[in-house]
Structures are given as C-alpha cells and as structure tokens.
Amino acid sequence: MTENWKFRRRTFLKHGAQAATLAGLSGLFPETLRRALAVEPDIRTGTIQDVQHVVILMQENRSFDHYFGHLNGVRGFNDPRALKRQDGKPVWYQNYKYEFSPYHWDTKVTSAQWVSSQNHEWSAFHAIWNQGRNDKWMAVQYPEAMGYFKRGDIPYYYALADAFTLCEAYHQSMMGPTNPNRLYHMSGRAAPSGDGKDVHIGNDMGDGTIGASGTVDWTTYPERLSAAGVDWRVYQEGGYRSSSLWYLYVDAYWKYRLQEQNNYDCNALAWFRNFKNAPRDSDLWQRAMLARGVDQLRKDVQENTLPQVSWIVAPYCYCEHPWWGPSFGEYYVTRVLEALTSNPEVWARTVFILNYDEGDGFYDHASAPVPPWKDGVGLSTVSTAGEIEVSSGLPIGLGHRVPLIAISPWSKGGKVSAEVFDHTSVLRFLERRFGVVEENISPWRRAVCGDLTSLFDFQGAGDTQVAPDLTNVPQSDARKEDAYWQQFYRPSPKYWSYEPKSLPGQEKGQRPTLAVPYQLHATLALDIAAGKLRLTLGNDGMSLPGNPQGHSAAVFQVQPREVGNPRFYTVTSYPVVQESGEELGRTLNDELDDLLDANGRYAFEVHGPNGFFREFHGNLHLAAQMARPEVSVTYQRNGNLQLNIRNLGRLPCSVTVTPNPAYTREGSRRYELEPNQAISEVWLLRSSQGWYDLSVTASNTEANYLRRLAGHVETGKPSRSDPLLDIAAT
C-alpha cells in the first residue's frame, strides 16, 4: 500500500464539514459520497495506467435536459445560443397545434416518478431531429416529453454532478432505441459490417440471416479483451423475464420486488450468438451470463478480486426506464458506489462510468451532430463509411444528448466537459488503458468523438477540497420507498400551459470546466462576380497545448433562418488523405447558394461544440457597390481574442463592434475603414474566463449587415462555464 491512496481521516472530516455547512445538516450528506470524496487517487505513473479497474453502469432512457437541463453551469435551459426555429423563436418552443416548452415535474406534488415511456424508435428520433432543425418533438411525442427534473427531484444525481465530472455533450450513438445503442456500447457498431447495410435499428435484434430472432453475430469488445488476456465480468442480478401484464395486479409492494431479478434484457452480450450458444461451463458464459449482483460486486471489491473491466446491468425496477423512476436508479447507483468504495485501496485505482443508453424521446434542445448523409447537406474531411443507413439513406447518429458522470478519485470537483462523446468513447477509454483496439468503430466516429481521457486528472493535481452542494439530499433508499407509493395517490405531472410565456431557466452559479480540443473558425466571403456565398470552416484544435488526444474533428451545423436546409460539416484538425489522393483537413470550403432568397438576402447561423457560434446576415446583390467588411478572429495563447476586419468593398465604412454586456463592462468600439483597409484589435477576455460575444455592424454596407461571433477561447487549460448560463434564455 502507498500513502497516496490512504483513506485519510482528516480529509474525510474536512469534506464532511464542508458538506454539512452547505447542506445545513450533516445527516443529509450521503455516506457513499463522503467516502468516495475522501479517497485520493493511487498515483504511481501519473498516467491512465494507474487505473486498475473500470466499472461501467449503463442506465435506461433519460435525456440530458430531462435530468440536468436545470443544473447550474451546464449547457441547459439557459443556453444563450440554442438553435432557432425558422420563425426566429428558439427551439425551447415546440409547436404542434399549440405551443409547448419544457415544464417542471415536481415530485413533491405529482407522480412524476411514474410516467410512461415516449416514442423512441428510429423513425421517431429522425422525425424529431428533422434534418437538424430539432423542432418536431410535439409532432411525434405527447406533452410529457417536455418534462424535466430539478435538484429536489433527483438530489443524488445532482450531488454526483457536484462532486465529480458531468459530460454535457455525451450523445447516444444512434437516433434509435435501446438495443442498437447498447450494441454500440459493447461492440462499436450495430451492424455485422461497416458499410451501412443490415443495421439494427430496432430492439428485436433479428438480422434475418441466422434464423434465430434476437441473435446477432459479430465480435464484441469483451471477446477482444479475453483474447488479450484482460480480465472482465458482467454483474447482473438475474436474466431477462417477460414483463407481462400479470404483475400489474399483484400486491403493490411486491411488484418491484419481483422485478429485482429481471435485467430487462439489457445485457447486450446475451444477444450475440457466441454468448447465447456458449456452453454453460465456458469462459464466455461464466463471465457474461451468470447472475451475480451488487452483493457479489461488493465481495469482490473487499477481497481485491474486482476484474479490470466490469459491466453492470441493473434490474428492471432500478434501470430508470419509464415507468420506473429516477429514485430507484439513485438507490441502485448508491449501492454500487457503496460497494466500490468499501475498500479504499481498490477505489483509489477505480473509474466508475455512469451513462444512459438513449433519451427515450424526452426533450433535449441540442441538435445531434451527424455526418453529411447525401449531396447538398454538407461535407466531411474524414470518411463517413458505415455512418449512413443504406436502406433509408439517413444518418445513423449521433443521437441526442444523454447524461454521463465520470466518478473516480481522478475526476472530483463538480466539473463539466463540453467535449463531444458517444457510447464508443467508453470503448476508446478502454482502448487507451488496455491497448485492445475495437475494430468496429468507424473513422468518422473516431474523429468526432473523444476517448474520455480528458475527464480525468491522472497527475492528481485536481482540486480534492471541493465538496458538493448537497442541500436537501435524503437517503436514497428512503426516497426509493417513498417514490414507490407516489403512483397511487399523487396526480400525474400534467402540462401546465399551451401558451407558455416564459422558459424554465437554470440554477445560478458557474461551474469549473475542462479543456476541450476545439479551436474553431467560420468565415464568410461574398463572391460578387460569381454571385455566391463562400463559407470557410476551420479547426485548429491540434495546435492546442495539453490536448490529451492530440487531434479531433468538429461537426459544424449551418442553420438557415429562412431559406434553405441545415447542413453539417465535419472538419478534422489534422490532414486526411482522400481516396483521390487529395489531402483535406483543418479547413473546408463550400458554397451556400441555396441560402440566398430571390432578392439576394441571406441569414444563417453556424453552430459548433462548446457554444461556438457565428451569425451572418446581409444581401449579396446589394454588396457589389457597397462597403464589404470581412471578419475573422485569431485566438491567442493567453486566452484573448484578436478581431480582424478588412473592407473589401468599394466604399468606406464605419464599423461598430458591440460586446455582450454579460461578458465585459467595455463599451462598443468603432473603426473607420477605407476600401481595402484592415484593422486588428485585441479583446481581453480574462474577466469572462475566455468567453466572448461580439456583434459587428457597419455603415455603407448591404442591408441588415451583421456578423456575430461568440464562443470560448481555448488555451488547453481548465476554465469556467459560460457566464450567460446564469441569465434566463429569451
């Protein structure tokens, strides 16, 4: 044993005292969180190799906004740069006969713990997404899909987010239901080959070639671990049992007791032929198919026999799939965390990943980043092979956002990450730790989605003094018992108004943020002679210091305000050699002719990761005889922003740059530019922690000329969440 991992009484008491101050009552601080926070990592190499155990629990069917849209410091209900509908309203407002917006499911007065599942099939998710507009939620779902929880409703999960690291850009792998997403989680794809054919888009898993419905047949990641000699195991309370209606009429208390042995068919390995047909005494069967639950997990932890990789499959009543409520999941996660922290020596070397397979059709405001799926809807510098479902011609994913919390001694501090991830990111993390490659992950997905390593401070320099705000957090087991009976005497959470006058907002307060590998650009050039709009997108993320991956790709979404359809562009931060021999990467150019109306007017936005935003308005036809300021930025290593403006037009102009007052006390700046004259001015961003929002207007220009630039300047170092998240969206 080394000094680094020791369960220090002084540290334990310090965290407990901090939490008691925040909560007002020390008894409200869950013992499992106090124990987990009090253990410091076992630092031997200062790298990912210090991780000896990875434990993964994938829960069911909850979206990010549904659970964490109200949490402070995340890109939730106050997102200042959410997509807009074509009528100019933000996508918080969803139309279908009436207008709907997110509404609170108050578990103190309603039976919000007990709601029906929404439509979450392939066709439903794609209809909601609507080619990127994300505006058809109410055309597909019931109003209940707009419901969300607050801290008082899911206190333990908010406490986990306050204590450890939450991902605000973790996406389900497919715009589809549970089983295909779990296939991605366990094997890197949902098809026997990587060409987009025979993709499993439903839950039956029958591929028509084996003759046994519910069986799939390709190599899984656990099989690759076995071949490499890496120890792994599945923990589950029992197998799958049909959820027929009979149990609805048995004794109320015993209803969920009966479901404690039912894994709801969520052990994805049971769908694969090699596992389903394995002899009962075989290694595959013994590792993946046996019933061994949290009690056995705790025993293995205490006896120091926990495998290197563990997948946990929750029982039906604790998996959080509607109608089973979040309090049941909180209880189960508490048990898992209690088991993992019962031996401080083991916990000091363990990473616990809590994620969700898909969002069930519950509302999330962020559009899904996807590859271009046909001509005219974007471009990519990296191959999109295997990412377009052949029979429909639609993108497979990514899907909408779902929660992921990284719980470990290396990920303390209530931080948030805006790096883009999906279920294959979990496999990529295992790749980095154990050196076993998952060959099924597509090139596009490897480029766009990170490997989770940025969530962890393996040097141990993280702030271990941070205690979470645990106000009003009761014991999770008592909440679970109370939640069960609510279904019998509380009304359902009915939608409150068909003409919402306000949006829900978020808790106040910023949150520490982790560095992300993006340094993005979007500039517009008006080609007067050819009558074209030319968009240039750039990604300099590879040049960022401290980038744990060294490279990444970013998905830009071009969102037209009135004319044209959304487009998606994938731009790598590194060169990629194409089949033609051409080298693409770092920048990408395209013409946006379909975004011009008959009079030459254009109005569109460009969205990217971590709140990256550009907005362009003007009139191409009128620009020929006018001043024509073109605007770009240079990111400085010290976190400041250099704004570059050049007048390429025929007339002089007066350019006004107006900052968002939420970021700075500085007023507008004005510049006089002759034709072909340029200026470069630095904007200091220290007071806004690197966030900026600048609007550029000018005289003697095309009608309604506007260039708006917003986002965050990355330096490779941690920062703070967007200050505008403290201000209600409008």
From Swiss-Prot:
Gene3D superfamilies named among the record's database cross-references: Alkaline Phosphatase, subunit A (3.40.720.10)
Primary enzyme class: hydrolase
GO cellular component, one term: extracellular space
Residues spanning the signal sequence: 1-38
Catalytic activity of the protein: a 1,2-diacyl-sn-glycero-3-phosphocholine + H2O = phosphocholine + a 1,2-diacyl-sn-glycerol + H(+)
Pfam families xref list: Phosphoesterase, PLipase_C_C
Transmembrane segments: none
GO terms assigned for molecular function: lipase activity; phosphatidylcholine phospholipase C activity; sphingomyelin synthase activity; toxin activity
Keyword Transmembrane helix (UniProt): no
Keywords, ordered alphabetically: Cytolysis, Hemolysis, Hydrolase, Signal, Toxin, Virulence
InterPro entries documented for this protein: Alkaline_phosphatase_core_sf, PC-PLC, Phosphoesterase, PLipase_C_C, TAT_signal
Biological process terms in GO annotation: hemolysis in another organism; lipid catabolic process; protein secretion by the type II secretion system
Post-translational modification: Predicted to be exported by the Tat system. The position of the signal peptide cleavage has not been experimentally proven.
E.C. no: 3.1.4.3
Cysteines joined through disulfide linkages: none
NCBIfam families referenced in this protein's UniProt entry, alphabetically: PC_PLC
Recorded family membership: Belongs to the bacterial phospholipase C family.
Known function: Hydrolyzes sphingomyelin in addition to phosphatidylcholine.
Record's protein name: Hemolytic phospholipase C
